[in-house]
């Protein structure tokens, strides 16, 4: 039985096999389709066209063309594509992850990032090859891993920059360092997925099963900034994206970025970007390729009317 599934044109794909029998499979979501991963499976998604939204235990994320996201096995993500969206993904069982981790320097961690057009094309080609080869015989695991090895190696290569930080993590053994890094990466992703509010250290410590003191110390050592500073930076970047991509009022952007009042938001935004939110939005709109045409049309009409 082929383990490739596709949700297209508004279809909802439910991946809800029991934890003990969670399978490795290739998944695609396109054109208003959606996929719900209820099985206990690590998942990786790459956005190839359009936009998709992801809701998971780590929060809410927007994937644009070229973005990728990797989620832990208990994240239970729901991915929804827009009308032009197309994304491909992999769900990996616990056994598949254990086998993959045996490859030298080949491990996958929770996180998100961006790929070049060339890497995106490679992902699609390798995903298609894996979808053709994955079957579920009685001895499924050796076949599954053999079929997925090329794309998993490629995805691990895309995470090379993230994995370079593993040596900063405390621990005597390589496996312990990887374990700590995996937990901290999930906390970092949790901050990105909750840019609409202030995240407390206690939440992140509970997520990683570390004490608040140990978590804060290790986080700063790994990312060169405190959890509070990282949260503030991500919230400001989130606000900047809202100013560029939406018509929300400044007060609405402030509220959507976790600020109680506009004054504190204005101070934080100016400290981060060196200008006001209004000025930032105006500059972003004027830099768009179609802005000159959009503003030129009414000017010509006014001149023709003689007013």
Where would I find each of the regions flagged by the language model?
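Amphipathic alpha-helical segments enriched in hydrophobic/aromatic residues interleaved with Lys/Arg
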Residues: 2-4, 103-165, 189
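N-terminal regulatory/effector-sensing and dimerization cores
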Residues: 2-113, 140
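Short hydrophobic/aromatic patch on the recognition helix
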Residues: 66, 215, 219, 264-265, ...
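Short, Lys/Arg-enriched N-terminal segment that forms or immediately precedes the first helix
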Residues: 166-175, 217-223
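Terminal helix-turn-helix DNA-binding modules in bacterial transcription factors
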Residues: 185-193, 197-202, 221-261, 282-307
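Helix-turn-helix
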Residues: 205-212, 216
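Core residues of bacterial helix-turn-helix
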Residues: 208, 257-258, 269
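Key DNA-contact positions within bacterial/archaeal DNA-binding proteins
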Residues: 213, 262-263, 278
